[in-house]
């Protein structure tokens, strides 16, 4: 059996990395396809992070057009669709592994479905509240196995009409990654010094995570 892991940005790599590590440890055959933001210098060229984590990226699909607005983004997705079809024809994976709610993952799910390639979807059934949420649920309609991270997502998938035997309540893989990631915890001292947080353990604090709204990219600063 061969698994093909598909990833388009740093944001979903944390979902995929711990699963890939299990595949690596158990000698399960897999390939990685990296596309979109992973290959762009303007977004940090996060392909290097994948390679730094010890994984070889066999397939790269350059899809992004200059300009980065709604129209170039949409046209880029169709470029991806054509290239990913060729990849599946060459690679012939037994399963496609997708994560999250990004547009490129939606395109990959459509291609996989129409080439009769089974799809497993990580963190299916969650709510994003914008077009990303629509993409997530659309991916779910093409997927054959749904990995839910929490009971609410599990119940939502059932309400969306998915068969119970296809839904697995497994938790969020990035939390496993965070818990076992020695690089993060070994660097806590330097992180506290850099951001003047030496006394963090002695007081209450609130951690705020910012996530831009896809439809409002012009307002993002």
Residue ranges and their predicted role:
Residues 1:
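N-terminal Rossmann-like NAD(P)+-binding domain of SDR-like oxidoreductases, especially those catalyzing
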Residues 9, 36-38, 125, 212-213:
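Residue-level signal for short, function-critical loop segments
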């Amino acid at each position: 059996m061969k698994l093909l892991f598909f990833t388009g940005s740093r944001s979903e790599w944390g979902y995929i990395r711990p699963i890939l590590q299990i595949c690596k440890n158990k000698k399960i055959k897999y390939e990685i396809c990296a596309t979109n933001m992973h290959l762009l210098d303007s977004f940090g060229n996060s392909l290097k992070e994948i390679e730094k984590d010890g994984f070889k990226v066999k397939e790269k699909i350059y899809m992004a057009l200059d300009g980065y607005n709604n129209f170039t983004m949409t046209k880029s997705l169709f470029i991806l669709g054509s290239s990913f079809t060729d990849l599946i024809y060459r690679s012939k994976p037994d399963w496609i592994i997708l994560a999250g709610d990004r547009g490129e993952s939606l395109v990959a799910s459509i291609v996989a479905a129409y080439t009769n390639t089974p799809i497993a979807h990580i963190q299916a059934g969650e709510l994003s509240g914008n077009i990303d949420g629509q993409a997530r649920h659309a991916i779910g309609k093409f997927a054959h196995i749904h990995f839910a991270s929490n009971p609410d997502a599990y119940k939502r998938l059932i309400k969306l009409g998915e068969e119970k035997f296809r839904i697995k309540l497994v938790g969020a893989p990035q939390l496993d990654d965070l818990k076992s990631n020695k690089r993060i915890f070994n660097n806590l001292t330097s992180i506290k010094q850099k951001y003047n947080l030496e006394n963090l353990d002695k007081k209450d604090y609130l951690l705020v995570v910012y996530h831009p709204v896809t439809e409002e990219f012009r307002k993002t600063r």
